Swiss-Prot record:
HAMAP family: BioW (MF_00668). Its EC number is 6.2.1.14. Its cofactor is Mg(2+). Pathway: Metabolic intermediate metabolism; pimeloyl-CoA biosynthesis; pimeloyl-CoA from pimelate: step 1/1. This is 6-carboxyhexanoate--CoA ligase. It catalyses: heptanedioate + ATP + CoA = 6-carboxyhexanoyl-CoA + AMP + diphosphate. The gene is bioW.
Amino acid sequence: MTFYSVRMRASLQGQHISGAETLVSCPTDVPRLTAQFVERAMNHAKGVPDAITTKIESIPESDIQRVPRLLTREYQARDCHDAHGFVQQQLTTVCSAEVAQKAVDLLLTIRNMRGAILLDAHSARRLEPDHNRGIRASNFGDASSISAKPDNKEIGISKNHYHEALILSSKVMSAPGIIAEICISDDPDYTTGYVSLNGVYTRVHTMKRLGSPLGGRVFILDSEKASVATAINHIENTPVLIL
């Protein structure tokens, strides 16, 4: 069986606006999903993009890894301060307090990165080769959508932040050496973020104020378990279906 990677990236004046992707096994799904992704980009809360790029690649089934999705839970924060403190406390279960604080500080201050920050779990040093581009999780999909026709609300026109973030984070956390991920959506009308570690994806409410353009991701790498190149190659290039 041949799979197809369908990807969309949209930008406005060089700044990221929207992105979406999936893996599908049915060729007739490709044009439909491509059109839905483009329509999503054209109706984004961050504005109408001036550039939209779509990319479609065939992938042999033998190249695809299958990994389980993360377990899920939620944390109802009282306010942004409580949410940030909770995320930082969770990170201290897998890295030092210094690294945990650095990760949260970066998440709350970095602007307009196209991808994620890669942070060393021992030195708190940024490891991504290009600090503007960052690390871009790609080549992943939800196995449960392969056998059933995707729902427009789930994968196409309307963005399901929770589902898409869970699938992305499940792929990221399967990478060699990655011990944690934290994220805030850059959508101004979505204030929930998450922290993933120890096999669990925790939705954290009130990570930012409504209307805020704040958003980004930080991946934390245990550089004693895997090299930077190995982790990046898996996150960006290895095709993964989430079970």
